[in-house]
Every structure is written in C-alpha cells, then in structure tokens.
Design a protein with these regions (language model features):
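Hydrophobic ligand-binding cavity/cleft-lining segments
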Residues: 1-45, 161-164
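Beta-strand/loop substructures that line and gate deep hydrophobic ligand-binding cavities in soluble
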Residues: 79-131, 151
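Short, surface-exposed coil-to-beta transition loops
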Residues: 3-5, 60-64, 87-90
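A short, structured loop/turn motif at beta-sheet edges
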Residues: 11-15, 68-73, 93-102
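Beta-strand elements of well-folded, non-transmembrane domains
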Residues: 10-12, 56, 109-113
Length: 164
C-alpha cells in the first residue's frame, strides 16, 4: 500500500476551508476531471456518490467516489467505489491552530497487477499524485484566503466570518 500525505496552513476560517474542500467544482479544477453522475455540483456530504471522468497518462479514466465519512468541519473521507485502483482512500483533516486552518490530506492506495502495479505506483503514481495533491492544497489556500471563495460558496454565511 502506498501512502501520500501533505499539509498546508491557510489564513481563513475552518468552516470556509472545510466547505471549499468538499466543493465539487473546486475538486474538478484541481483534478482536471469532470463529474458525470451522482452529485455533480455543490458540496459533498455523507453518503454522496460521484462518478468522475477524465484522461490521465493518455488513457480515459473513470473513478467512482463515495463519501464514506463526514464529520464537519474537521474531517471527511472519500473512498473509491470503482476505478483503476485496487483500493483508494483519501482522508481530509482540518483543525484550527492560532487562528489559522491546518489542512492535512492523506491518501492510501494499492494497485492491481502485483509487482508491476507496485513499480507503477512507486515510480509514476506516487510522484504524480503528490504533485496533484500539492497543487490542490495550494489552489484551495489561494481561494480561501482571497475573495474568490465566494464564487464557490456564494450562499454560505458561516464561510464569511474570519477567524482573526
């Protein structure tokens, strides 16, 4: 099993960061995939299912995401239902420290194909997923710390209040 973890500190309220983390449009921007079925707009909640489609490494990809745990505003987990991985799980943990939000994302995955899967995981997917995760966290930080968050959360009163 491969594990990838990354953390970012965000100068924005915890609730805003949590909601942005669950926002489907923002996830689509960072993954370069499109939600096709299930919940395709807004923010995910417990029990939601989404089918994502896109191209990765020159191949069409389908990835079904299930929201398997949802504990706002501190934690949610998405787990692959169907897709190219043997197993894929992504934990999103958020907490507040000194008026800032700390967001830690941890992904765990395994691939089919035994030894070949482990080689592909180590040399191709771990670096690729690490870069994608870092890009997602930096984008989330940029949006949360600016007025851009209003585009993704136009109706969220709780997201409007600063923790400073």
């Amino acid at each position: 099993m491969f594990t990838i973890s990354d953390t970012i500190h965000i100068d924005a309220p915890l609730e805003r960061c949590f909601l942005l983390s669950t926002n489907i449009e923002l996830v689509a921007l960072s993954l370069h995939m499109k939600p096709l079925e299930g919940k395709t707009t807004g923010c995910v909640v417990a029990g939601d299912k989404l089918l994502w489609a896109g191209w990765k490494f020159g191949f069409p990809q389908m990835h079904e995401t299930l929201i398997t745990r949802y504990e706002p505003p501190h934690f949610f987990q998405d787990t692959m239902g169907r897709g190219r991985f043997k197993r894929f799980q992504h934990d999103h943990r958020l907490y507040s420290v000194d008026g800032r939000t700390v967001l830690n994302d941890k992904l765990r995955f395994t691939l089919p194909l035994g030894f070949l899967g482990r080689l592909v995981g180590k040399h191709i997917l771990v670096p690729y997923i690490s870069r994608t995760l870092r890009r997602r966290l930096v984008l989330l930080k940029k949006i949360a710390e600016s007025e851009d968050w209003r585009h993704f959360l136009p109706d969220e009163d709780t997201a409007k209040h600063s923790s400073h």
